[in-house]
Swiss-Prot record:
Keywords: Chaperone, Cytoplasm, Ribosome biogenesis, rRNA processing. This is Ribosome maturation factor RimM. Pfam families: PRC, RimM. One of its GO terms (biological process) is rRNA processing. The PRC barrel domain binds ribosomal protein uS19. The keyword rRNA processing applies. It comes from Streptococcus pneumoniae (strain JJA). The lineage of its organism: Bacteria, Bacillati, Bacillota, Bacilli, Lactobacillales.
């Protein structure tokens, strides 16, 4: 079974079994809702166990969660640094033109018939995501995910068609 990272437990919160989670999901309210089941992975990315969310609230930049049947700091302190993941079968269906990062990373990028490179990372600097494209013999290319640049995303064929606008490629 495939799992996808949704957050990391960075610390405990108080004495009643709450944990601070640095979330990396766009669906925190759903992922951390009471009764949701998540997979717990250790620092070596090994599956530890399935956990059920007992409570969730936001505090500043963190999601504060508590696991069912784990209501004391001594029970949960060992989970600091562990990752929370969701099973692939539990991923939400997305609207047209929306993609999960794991679907985009690894796709080949083409301008016309010319291979530009492969998407290796996605950045979130502001209003739009920026795709980092690894190229042979050149520096990485930063492509904003906006309609004039990204023309077509073909997940089944692992291909993205783009138009590299003037000023985006400083090596040309």
């Amino acid at each position: 079974m495939n799992y996808f990272n949704i957050g990391k437990i960075v610390n405990t919160q108080g004495l009643q079994g709450e944990m601070r989670v640095l979330s990396v999901t766009d669906f925190a309210e759903e992922r951390f809702k009471k009764g949701a089941e998540l997979a717990l992975f250790d620092e070596k990315d090994q599956f530890v166990q399935t956990v059920t969310i007992a409570s969730h609230r936001k505090q500043k930049n963190f999601d504060i969660i508590k696991f069912k049947d784990m209501y004391h700091i001594n029970t949960i302190e060992k989970y600091k640094g562990y990752s929370l993941k969701v099973a692939e079968e539990d991923l939400n269906d997305l609207d047209d033109g929306e993609f999960y990062y794991h679907e985009i990373i690894g796709l080949e990028v083409y301008e016309g018939d010319s291979l530009v490179g492969t998407i290796k990372e996605i950045l979130q600097p502001g209003a739009n995501d920026v795709w980092v494209v690894k190229r042979k013999g050149k520096r990485d290319l930063l492509l904003p995910y906006i309609p004039p640049v990204v023309l077509n995303v073909d997940i089944p064929n692992k291909r993205v068609d783009v138009e590299i606008l003037e000023g985006l490629d400083d090596e040309d």
